[in-house]
Amino acid sequence: MERRPLHLHLLLFFSAWLLLLLLQGVSSLQFRREDFPDGFAFGAGTAAYQYEGAAAEDGRTPSIWDTYTHSGRHPEDGTGDVASDGYHKYKEDVKLMTEIGLEAYRFTISWSRLIPSGRGAVNPKGLQFYNNMINELVKAGIQIQVALYHSDLPQSLQDEYGGWINPKIVDDFTAYADVCFREFGDRVAHWTTVLEPNVMAQGCYDTGILPPNHCSYPFGNNCTGGNSTVEPYLFIHHNLLAHASAVRLYREKYQVAQKGIIGINMYSLWFYPLTDSAEDIGATERAKQFMYGWILHPLVFGDYPETIKKVVGSRLPFFSNHESELVTNAFDFIGLNHYSSVYTSNNNNVVKAPLQDLTADIATLFRATKNDTPTPEFLPGNTVDPQGLENALEYIRENYGNLTIYIQENGSGAPDGTLDDVERINYLQKYIAATLKAIRNGANVKGYSMWSFIDIYEIFGGYNSWHYGLVAVDFGSTERRRQPRRSASWYSDFLKNNAPIRVEDGSFVSAASHAQL
């Protein structure tokens, strides 16, 4: 028998060893709808100003969003006057939800439609609209998840006392929540008080790029008033107090009979330090405190994080003993809106000054990719990084306990509104897989809703923005014609037919068919 040279044996050995390493490094996961825990609900969402339209119909009065868009300050110079026309087409939309197989639908209520003066008399037409839509969802067997507020304060309250920067908002918000709980709570499974306050603080009250368009020089331009050094902190403080007040009301007056749950929502970016320098690592941790700790630390521990207290100093409101007790544990769940991750670095241009704004307090630069031009504001990235969602969930678990979490928004837009949205399907598969992996690693995630059910008037881009909907809307038509995208068929196959998603080596490939609805 012929002997092989030693170098050949070594070559074969190292080849086999390398192949084994490569195989071990291949991530392989195949899963179906049935692999998620009992009680887990898949859904999609919309928001009132962006979806309903009918801005001046049936007693609705202007919100701060109406004022902002009609002032011409919106970058696309459009308004939500018609939006997706959900006010008139909700029955058609619920039928589409049923055809897709949505298990849950998260929408927001327009405070200005339900209580046009901000407080006091309830608008019968507004009440009828929400009751009718909720009843359609009940008939369809779709779980109802309602958010009370998404940056659309009645303009009357903004004019009267400055809205969220005034403590009077706590009582008015609680009274508004009381109406919602009383009128709709027998059919609502989940209540979310406020959406994304942690990033609205910057956009609404520091840079002023969102309503009520508040900022102060030199921190922002072309604003209607404001003080960038203190108003972001007043906004968050009163959000937390209003949220906690509504939670206490719900628990004391409604929860036992209605058997729903209540929580608050946060925007969630994940952060990677641009370099391994101490400065960039410090900036990353600071960004996490302002993104997560600003909301979660008071809700879990009764006070703001030490990092924020140290940076902001006397500009940061404080909780009285009573308020600290009120906010602590004032939630049944936390909602996360998570889309992407960013790279973070220390903002060396920030000079410590007696008065500085929220952006300077964060003192961090953000990049969607390492080579992007940095920005000092919390702005959504466009990277596809499902590991970032897993990291965010693990960070929350390590720092605040294994809280009940609902992924309330996650999605990807298409710039041209294409119906053949394969990239969106790939994105959604990756993040749904990441959600399942996080659950298997111990995260207490109870639901996932993609953004959005239907094309809407987008916050930053209006009608000319990227389109996020499972269902396309022809905004050029007066009828606002609907047409399901390929992603709607894929989601339907996953939800209704238990079609598998296969994950191989970082590539997420659906085995589901794409039959048209």
UniProtKB/Swiss-Prot annotation:
Name the UniProt record assigns to this protein: Beta-glucosidase 20
Keywords, in A-Z order: Disulfide bond, Glycoprotein, Glycosidase, Hydrolase, Signal
Any GO BP annotation: carbohydrate metabolic process
Pfam families: Glyco_hydro_1
One GO MF term: beta-glucosidase activity
Residues in the signal sequence: 1-28
Organism: Oryza sativa subsp. japonica (Rice)
Reaction(s) the record says it catalyses: Hydrolysis of terminal, non-reducing beta-D-glucosyl residues with release of beta-D-glucose
Entry's family note: Belongs to the glycosyl hydrolase 1 family.
S-S pairs: 215-223
Top enzyme class: hydrolase
Enzyme Commission number(s) of this protein: 3.2.1.21
Positions bound to a beta-D-glucoside: 50, 150, 339, 409, 451, 468
List of catalytic residues: 196, 409
Gene: BGLU20
Glycosylation sites per record: 222, 227, 402, 410
InterPro entries associated with the record: Glyco_hydro_1 (IPR001360), Glyco_hydro_1_N_CS (IPR033132), Glycoside_hydrolase_SF (IPR017853)
